[in-house]
């Protein structure tokens, strides 16, 4: 199993740096100088070596040894980087990619599908696309989402009255 650890948002400057949106809790390990990142974009795979890294506006600015200029950096836009879980990644939580696509069950009925996860400072929110096409946000807390069954591909919710109508 591989985890997505970041995504190239855009190029930065003229020397080939890229801005990376980090999706891992270990950026200091995953994006260390000298690390080789495995990226995928549009069916192509890239192996890129980090030459330098620095924080910038809640993202990382990364310079790769293989990328010489802005034009080459622009070609990386949208590249997603993946890595194997670290040994300490094993816990009772869920990875975003495990939750995305789960059928959302309320009572005995499928009402929609998890389309994404938003991580907030206090709690995470499940983005759910209802059968009607409407999107709602559901707090990912045990009282509202008491059961997640990855094997069955389901997520049972018990929302308070009115939550699905917001």
Swiss-Prot record:
**What molecular function terms (GO) are annotated for this protein?**
ribosome binding
Q: What is this protein called?
A: Ribosome maturation factor RimM
Any Pfam family from its record, for instance, is RimM
Domain PRC barrel, residue spans: 91-163
Question: Can you name a GO cellular component term?
Answer: cytoplasm
Family of the protein in this entry: Belongs to the RimM family.
Q: By its UniProt entry, which InterPro entries does this protein fall under?
A: PRC_barrel-like_sf, PRC_RimM, RimM, RimM_N, RimM_N_sf, Transl_B-barrel_sf
Functional description taken from the UniProt entry: An accessory protein needed during the final step in the assembly of 30S ribosomal subunit, possibly for assembly of the head region. Essential for efficient processing of 16S rRNA. May be needed both before and after RbfA during the maturation of 16S rRNA. It has affinity for free ribosomal 30S subunits but not for 70S ribosomes.
Q: Which coarse location class describes where this protein primarily resides? A: cytoplasm
Read off the domain note: The PRC barrel domain binds ribosomal protein uS19.
Where in the cell?
Cytoplasm
What are the BP-aspect GO terms?
ribosomal small subunit biogenesis; rRNA processing
Q: Which UniProt keywords apply?
A: Chaperone, Cytoplasm, Ribosome biogenesis, rRNA processing
Description of how the protein assembles with itself and partners: Binds ribosomal protein uS19.
The domain of life for this entry's organism is Bacteria
């Amino acid at each position: 199993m591989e985890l997505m650890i970041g995504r190239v948002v855009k190029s930065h400057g003229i020397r080939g740096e890229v801005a990376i949106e980090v999706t891992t809790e270990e950026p200091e390990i995953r994006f260390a100088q000298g690390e080789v990142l495995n990226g995928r974009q549009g069916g192509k795979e890239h192996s890129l070596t980090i030459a330098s890294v620095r924080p910038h506006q809640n993202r990382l600015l990364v310079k790769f040894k293989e990328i010489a200029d802005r034009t080459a950096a622009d070609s990386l836009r949208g590249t997603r980087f993946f890595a194997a879980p670290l040994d300490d990644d094993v816990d009772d939580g869920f990875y975003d990619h495990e939750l995305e696509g789960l059928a959302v069950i309320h009572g005995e009925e499928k009402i929609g599908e998890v389309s994404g996860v938003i991580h907030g400072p206090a709690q995470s929110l499940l983005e759910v696309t209802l059968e009607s096409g409407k999107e709602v946000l559901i707090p990912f807390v045990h009282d509202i989402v008491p059961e997640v069954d990855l094997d069955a591909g389901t997520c049972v919710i018990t929302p308070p009255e009115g939550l699905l109508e917001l």
